């Protein structure tokens, strides 16, 4: 484990993230502009794709970070049987959920039950598929629906706020099952689907289109919110949630319904709306994709 990763164990995660939250919403022109300009330069942010390409037009760093894209700059795969990539970013890992376990990195895994904080819900994804997408600070930070879904419930699982960068993913055991996260459960035409919004160091919040800010500043217990009967349906490719700083979204899919797009591997750069998975025909046998070992 390198020095930086070791240091993340010792850092006051909550205090730093609380400070980041306040700074992100600061509208002092010198402070917010310095932050925006620094991130653009350090991470090579492409503002030409943004609905507002003028870096000075954003009232706060958070407004810049959660910026919208120009209409038409991302388009959904036209095949209705294709599951869409939910975000811009890079594939951290993807593949089958073997015996209830989700692959994180070489020698690292965690269970779907640990991730979701719900044994019964996790059972629906045994031998299913997962895809973990990392959103770096340069990326578009809104998460969209892979397919049309009816919101059933959300589960906020409190936890640590480790970095979710590539080094941390390789070196911190069960990282995504330890960090604070919001699991959003949907009913879809092909069965259950969960999108897990994973918090991280300096992430100042997760917002959903139906509930606003969903991750409390100091949550200390698992919180369930039941949305059945509320008729909250979100269309394929529509915005579902957003990160107020870079982090990770994990998609869980049930077994025997989809096959992952064959060109996708760990570290593949991805864009919102491209194919994540293709629906299997009724007479198609499921073949598990290969994972990094």
Curated annotation (Swiss-Prot):
The record marks 246-247 as: Cleavage (non-hydrolytic). This is Phosphatidylserine decarboxylase proenzyme. The keyword Transferase does not apply. Belongs to the phosphatidylserine decarboxylase family. PSD-B subfamily. Prokaryotic type I sub-subfamily. Its main location: membrane. The gene is psd. GO terms for biological process: phosphatidylethanolamine biosynthetic process. Its EC number is 4.1.1.65. It comes from Xylella fastidiosa (strain 9a5c).
């Amino acid at each position: 484990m390198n020095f930086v990763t070791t240091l993340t164990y010792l850092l006051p995660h909550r205090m730093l993230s609380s400070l980041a939250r306040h700074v992100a919403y600061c509208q002092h022109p010198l402070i917010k502009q310095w932050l925006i300009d620094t991130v653009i330069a350090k991470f090579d942010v492409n503002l030409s794709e943004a609905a507002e390409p003028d870096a000075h037009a954003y009232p706060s760093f958070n407004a810049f970070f959660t910026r919208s894209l120009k209409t038409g700059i991302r388009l959904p795969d036209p095949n209705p049987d294709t599951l869409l990539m939910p975000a811009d970013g890079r594939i951290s890992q993807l593949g089958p959920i073997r015996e209830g376990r989700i692959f994180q990195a070489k020698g690292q895994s965690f269970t779907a039950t640990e991730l979701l904080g719900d044994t019964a819900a996790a059972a629906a994804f045994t031998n299913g598929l997962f895809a973990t997408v990392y959103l770096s600070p340069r990326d578009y930070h809104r998460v969209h629906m892979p397919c049309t879904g009816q919101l059933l419930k959300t589960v906020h699982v409190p936890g640590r706020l480790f970095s979710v960068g590539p080094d941390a993913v390789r070196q911190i055991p069960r990282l995504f099952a330890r960090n604070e996260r919001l699991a959003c459960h949907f009913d879809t035409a092909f069965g259950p689907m969960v999108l897990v919004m994973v918090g991280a160091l300096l992430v100042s919040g997760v917002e959903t289109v139906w509930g606003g800010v969903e991750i409390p500043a100091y949550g200390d217990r698992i919180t369930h919110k039941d949305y059945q009967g509320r008729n909250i349906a979100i269309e394929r490719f529509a915005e579902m949630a957003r990160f107020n700083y870079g982090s990770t979204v994990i998609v869980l899919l049930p077994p025997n319904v989809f096959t992952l797009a064959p060109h996708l591997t760990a570290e593949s750069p991805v864009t919102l709306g491209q194919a994540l998975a293709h629906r299997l025909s009724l007479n198609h046998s499921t073949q598990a994709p290969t994972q990094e070992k």
